[in-house]
Structures are given as structure tokens and as C-alpha cells.
Amino acid sequence: MSARLPVLSPPRWPRLLLLSLLLLGAVPGPRRSGAFYLPGLAPVNFCDEEKKSDECKAEIELFVNRLDSVESVLPYEYTAFDFCQASEGKRPSENLGQVLFGERIEPSPYKFTFNKKETCKLVCTKTYHTEKAEDKQKLEFLKKSMLLNYQHHWIVDNMPVTWCYDVEDGQRFCNPGFPIGCYITDKGHAKDACVISSDFHERDTFYIFNHVDIKIYYHVVETGSMGARLVAAKLEPKSFKHTHIDKPDCSGPPMDISNKASGEIKIAYTYSVSFEEDDKIRWASRWDYILESMPHTHIQWFSIMNSLVIVLFLSGMVAMIMLRTLHKDIARYNQMDSTEDAQEEFGWKLVHGDIFRPPRKGMLLSVFLGSGTQILIMTFVTLFFACLGFLSPANRGALMTCAVVLWVLLGTPAGYVAARFYKSFGGEKWKTNVLLTSFLCPGIVFADFFIMNLILWGEGSSAAIPFGTLVAILALWFCISVPLTFIGAYFGFKKNAIEHPVRTNQIPRQIPEQSFYTKPLPGIIMGGILPFGCIFIQLFFILNSIWSHQMYYMFGFLFLVFIILVITCSEATILLCYFHLCAEDYHWQWRSFLTSGFTAVYFLIYAVHYFFSKLQITGTASTILYFGYTMIMVLIFFLFTGTIGFFACFWFVTKIYSVVKVD
């Protein structure tokens, strides 16, 4: 069973000096994952049964999580399948992030004693009579799950139990999940894990992995009297048709279930467990062997270098404009009494009387800016905490919990920004503004999320959010976020309107006919290309984490890409804004928001490409769920990038018109 495997279906989401040091510690490299335990996830000590105490346990509990598949967006709880169930045991409490991600951790019937070897121990036996409708339904669900390659996810001491095997490129891959079973097609083609053994050869037959060999590695605590700590748990799934079910010996042919089987079918579930001391692995670095088999770090460095090249290119362009062109423009404007010739050459000064003219649909723009500010700050703080190790994979659900809590608490800056800009746009309907800021964008996201949840409920998936959790989310929104938004809006409207460096003329200036490149749409389309070029490699790993259930842990890289994205959006927008001002087009507000916000359209196009080229998802429900959740991500990303572009352009316009003399 240790035969080499091809790659199976992917396994399963400027404080310069200080910041540089933090990022260097957070960027993953060889043996770097020890930083994951900064928040103080306490280790558990284990002892032999005769030495156990309150500080040193002998019993090792194995927990089971939801089962998922790369061929379906629908995960299912362990109890949805007809596997061996725990007779007793308390279900661990789950945080908000775990519930939103669909994690359902439950106790299992697999119980171990530290350092006690067990061989072919029977867990339970399941019997099916194909003539009984209930049994047939259970068996068909099991077959369908094997056909879609659903994967178990087991947990020991808050660590995933991994299945390690060789892949085609000679690398050792450790999968934090293992399949229920596999299928040989009616043409004799081995699907998924059926390639691991030549014993799986019967056509149109399912083979269920009803036995696991588990090996638990431990490291003795250096003090000696404190027992040992678990540093790894690995398993190998196997299939046996036990001849003596009451006394299984874990030998013989594999457990096959023909697609046309009838009569009585018995499946005995067994396991073997052994323990091995490993003094090379420390508890703080026990995730390394899993993370080092994840997508290669050098690809991430290529992504960073690619992004930095784009940033340097844009920075050079912006620096040339700011330091050379604008400097000369301003000097010549300020020196000339008769500016007729200068106006023909330097067009951006001509629009000084219209540059701060309120935009059309100023209400909507201010609402978008408020929500975008909320998302921008939330993303920055979440990624910063993730870099420090507080939101590592070991701290399950912490990333989503942190993001949701921050979004709720950041209602105040959202209301403040929306109110300040709406007032500067000359708006007077402050009640409408604050209500839209509180409910428009969050309402769209929640409506989409609720529709997706209805589909999950209908499919019986574990990813369906319980009614109580939905009520809790609504309570956080209405009882905390909305009042905080009103408070922020109150202070925003109370302050004086933003003072602009130049006065606005009463009569709008006529905008001359624009060339193709200075028209709004071409500029907006071009503006999103470079920011997207900075993130598309990182985007691949993020989508893999969400849809292919791979473990994402490279938050140092992600934070660097976040900073680069902010810089790129800002510089690309400033660059295009300058060209449009030189063409005497002063409608910069919406254009600046849409220029960088158009990056989200490229995100959507890439997500569509990813769905058809990388995923193996089948089924109408899974397809709707994929694109439904993708639209939520696209909207959030649109508000995030659009807000960056607007603020950058607002700063640029304010800066250049504040240093030029205007009669």
C-alpha cells in the first residue's frame, strides 16, 4: 500500500524597521512555523496509564471533523454517514469562524491510551440489507461519497491526522485528510486512491477503507517528570474484508462493494495504533512536516518579486510625474503672469475651478467609501494579527472570527468617512446616508449569504449555518455595528466640511472631446490590470485554500502582497488621474474609485477561469454555491480596492492644487 501515487485531487482557505522584522519572522521558510504558537496554545502532556495525573493524561481522544470533497462544495458532518459513532463524549465548543466555515468537530469511537499498542481492534460492524429502503439509502450515500472522493478529517491533540505518500515528482506529500474509499469504473479505470494497490481491480466496484494504521509520534518533555507531548499523527488507510468479523485479523482481500451488489453486506471497521518516540521534532514546530509539503515557497517568492517589479515601475512613473513634470508645471504656473501659452501645454491647471465639483451620485460614492474604509482597516488588522501567529491553522476558526468581530467594531470609521465625504459633496440627506452606509453593502452580502445558506440547508450540508448563529450575526450587525455607524456619522456630520485648496466655479467648465485613451472606460479597464498582476499568484493559493481545502498559512507573504496591492492601486490611479486632468477632464471622483475597483472584475474573470480549469466541481447546487460566494468576495474586493484608489487620488489632487497659485 506504500506504492507511489500520482497527484490525487488536491487536498482540502510602515513602521519600517519593526514591520520588516515582524514580516521576516512571519514569512514561512524552512522550519519557521514555530511562530504559530505565540498566542499561548498550551501543550498537553501525556503519560503511561499507571503514571497519569491531572497534569499528565493517559487517554488520547480522536476527534472527527466534517467530510469534504474537491468535486463538491457541499461538506457533510461525520454523523451524516453510516460510520461508527461515539457512544459518549462531549462535543467541543466551536467559535463563530468555525461555524461559518462549516467545521463540525465531534468525538469519535476511536480511543487510545498513550504508549499502548493496539492491533486490528474492532470498532464496530455495519450491516446492510439491500432490500431494505433505509439500508439501501445509506449504502447509496456511501457509494456516492466514494465516487466524489469525500475525505475524512481526523484530529488528535489539535493536530490533523495526516496521510503521507509519495507523489509523481518524488516529493513526500502529507494530506490532512484521507478518502472514505475509491471506485473502479466499469471500464477498469482506477479513480483517485484506488491507484495505491493492484488488489483494487474489479470493475464497477467500490472499495471502502475500513481499516487505518495509525502511528503517533511523541517527544519526551525535557524535565522528565512531565511525560511526553504529541508531535505528529500519521495514518495509512487500508481495506480488508474480514473473514472473522468478531475476531478480525486484518488480512485477506479488500472490502469490495459491487455497484450491483444485493443481499446482506457487512462492513467491519478496525484500527491499529502504535507509538514512536521522535526526539528531533519539538512541540512548537510539530506543524512543519505538514506545512513543508504544502505549495512551494519559491512560487510565493516569485509572486513577491513579480509584484515588486510592477510597484517599482509604477513608482518610477509616479515619481517622474511628481518630481519632474508637476514640479516644472507648478514652477512655470507660479512664475507666469500671462498663462495662455502655459495653459495650452499644461492642461491640468485649467480645471482648478471644477476639480472639487461634487460628483454625480455622491450619496452612493460616499456610502461605498464608508464600507470600503471598514473593509480596508479590517483586512489590515486581521492580516497583521495573522502575521504574529494569532490566527494560525492551529487556532481553528480564529481568522474568520477576528474578521467578523473587527468588521462589527469598525462601524464608527465607516459612518465617519461616509458622512465627511457626503457633506463635502454638498449632501444634506444625512439620515439616508447613514442608513445606506449601515445597510446597503452589508445587506447585499447578507442576502447573498442567506440564499447560499438556504441551498446548503436544502442539501443537508454541514456548511449550513444554524438558525441560532444567523440570529447572532444579525444581532451583531443591528445591535453593535449599526449603532457604531450612527456614532461615526454623527461626528462626521458635526465636523465642518472638508476644506478644498481652490474654489469651485458656479458654472461648470465644458470638457473638450477626449481621445480614446482618455475616455473613462479604457482608463478604468487599464487601471485594474497592474494591481491584479500583483495578486493573481497569491489569489491562486487563496482559492485553493477555500475550494480545494488546502491549508493556508503563508500570512507573511499575504501581508506583503496586501501592502504591495495598496501601493499599486494608489499609484495606478494617480497616474491615470494625472493623464485625465491634463486632458482637462475633472470628473475624477468616480473614475478613481472605479479605476482601482476594476481589479475586482479581473478577480471575477480569474475565478471563472479557476472554476473551469482547476476545479472538478459537479452538480448544480455546488456550481451555484461557488459563484454565489464568489460574488460576495468580488463585492468586498471592489469596495476595498476602489476605496484605496479614491483616497490616493483625493490626496494627489488636494496636494497639487494646494501648491499652485490660482487667481
Swiss-Prot record:
Keyword Cytoplasm: yes
Xref: Pfam families: EMP70 (PF02990)
Transmembrane segments: 301-321, 375-395, 399-419, 438-458, 467-487, 523-543, 555-575, 592-612, 632-652
Ranges of the Lumenal topological domain: 29-300, 396-398, 459-466, 544-554, 613-631
Keyword Transmembrane assigned: yes
Record topological domains on the Cytoplasmic side: 322-374, 420-437, 488-522, 576-591, 653-663
GO cellular component, one term: endosome
Subcellular location per the Swiss-Prot or TrEMBL entry: Endosome membrane; Golgi outpost; Cytoplasm, Cytoskeleton, Microtubule organizing center
GO BP term, pick one: protein localization to membrane
Bilayer disposition of the protein: Multi-pass membrane protein
Tissue: Ubiquitously expressed. Especially abundant in pancreas, highly expressed in kidney, lower levels in heart, brain, skeletal muscle and placenta. Lowest expression in lung and liver.
S-S pairs: none
Signal peptide: 1-28
Keywords, in A-Z order: Cytoplasm, Cytoskeleton, Endosome, Golgi apparatus, Membrane, Signal, Transmembrane, Transmembrane helix
Function: In the intracellular compartments, may function as a channel or small molecule transporter.
PANTHER family referenced in this protein's UniProt entry, alphabetically: TRANSMEMBRANE 9 SUPERFAMILY MEMBER 2, TRANSMEMBRANE 9 SUPERFAMILY PROTEIN
Record-stated family: Belongs to the nonaspanin (TM9SF) (TC 9.A.2) family.
UniProt-recorded name of the protein: Transmembrane 9 superfamily member 2
Organism: Homo sapiens (Human)
Name of the encoding gene: TM9SF2
